UniProtKB/Swiss-Prot annotation:
GO molecular function: histone deacetylase activity, NAD-dependent; NAD+ binding; zinc ion binding
Record's cofactor remark: Binds 1 zinc ion per subunit.
Active site residues per record: 123 (proton acceptor)
Protein name per its UniProtKB record: NAD-dependent protein deacetylase
Gene3D superfamilies, per database record: SIR2/SIRT2 'Small Domain, TPP-binding domain
Domain Deacetylase sirtuin-type, first and last residues per copy: 1-254
Gene encoding the protein: cobB
Subcellular location: Cytoplasm
Residue numbers binding Zn(2+): 131, 134, 156, 159
Main subcellular localisation: cytoplasm
Length: 256
């Protein structure tokens, strides 16, 4: 028999009280409440745009045009987005010493904006851009200017090389340092909140499994089911902002 929502909140609070090393693993679903679309939902990015792989981006000008067209449409949504209740709750948990790390697949920077200091970005971020030839770094502001003034194939002003955002494309290796750190944290944690992710993108999706295999209690917060729900100790099929705020409210009321 399923336990009630309030019983789940209470059980989560009891787990947090006993925890010495809790972490959060987040995906696109945590940021939808901030107005940033996710990938796989009926209104997600892959319903609106084709996936451009890393190999396509490198060799195919038409694919780069498609990517930058998508980026030009979406970048303002990301820039205008503000942290929501879920981001703010995770930042408050860290501030109280109840959360060691946030491991995120997101590129929006909202965890840092909310106040989290210990954030591992598995898929990079949208703040930086780099020439693939001479490695000149371009800030976001300069890229925005280029997108307004140039055709949709951004080139380095120094050497003419292809400019690429510092995000991880499909088919591109994940940054080794960040992946190794995430794996080490997953090995050590005793609680992992798994929030807003379908757990379909490898190797990032392996992180919660590593935590589970090493004895951690997993708390899933998703609006939909995933194929890995069976490894969770507690599952909330609800808004991340609502659930995390309610958990935080209990912590505050208990003065923990």
């Amino acid at each position: 028999m399923d336990i009630s929502y309030h019983e789940k909140i209470s059980k989560t609070y009891e787990l947090i009280k006993k925890s010495t090393y809790s972490v959060a693993f987040t995906g696109a679903g945590i940021s939808t409440e901030s107005g940033i679309p996710d990938f796989r939902s009926p209104n997600g990015l892959w319903q609106r745009f084709r996936i451009v792989t890393y190999q396509e981006f490198i060799i195919d000008r038409k694919a780069r045009n498609e990517f930058w067209k998508m980026k030009r449409e979406l970048i303002q949504e990301i820039i205008n987005a503000k942290p929501n209740n879920a981001h703010n709750a995770l930042a408050e948990l860290e501030k109280r010493g109840l959360l060691k790390y946030v491991i995120t697949q997101n590129i929006d920077g909202l965890h840092q904006m909310a106040g989290n200091k210990s954030v591992i970005e598995l898929h990079g971020n949208q703040r930086g851009y780099i020439c693939l030839d001479c490695e000149k770094v371009y800030p976001l502001e300069e890229v925005l200017k280029m997108l307004k003034e140039q055709e949709l194939d951004l080139r380095c002003e120094v050497c003419g090389g292809i400019i690429k955002p510092t995000i991880v494309f499909f088919g591109e290796p994940m940054p080794e340092k960040e992946l190794l750190m995430a794996q080490q944290i997953a090995n050590k944690c005793d609680i992992m909140f798994v929030i807003g992710t379908s757990l379909q993108v490898e190797p990032a999706a392996s992180i919660p499994r590593i935590a589970y295999q090493n004895g951690a209690k997993l708390i899933f917060i998703n609006k939909v089911q995933t194929e890995w729900d069976w490894i969770a100790e507690i599952i909330f099929y609800d808004s991340a902002g609502k659930v995390l705020k309610d958990i935080l409210d209990v912590i505050k009321s208990e003065k923990f």
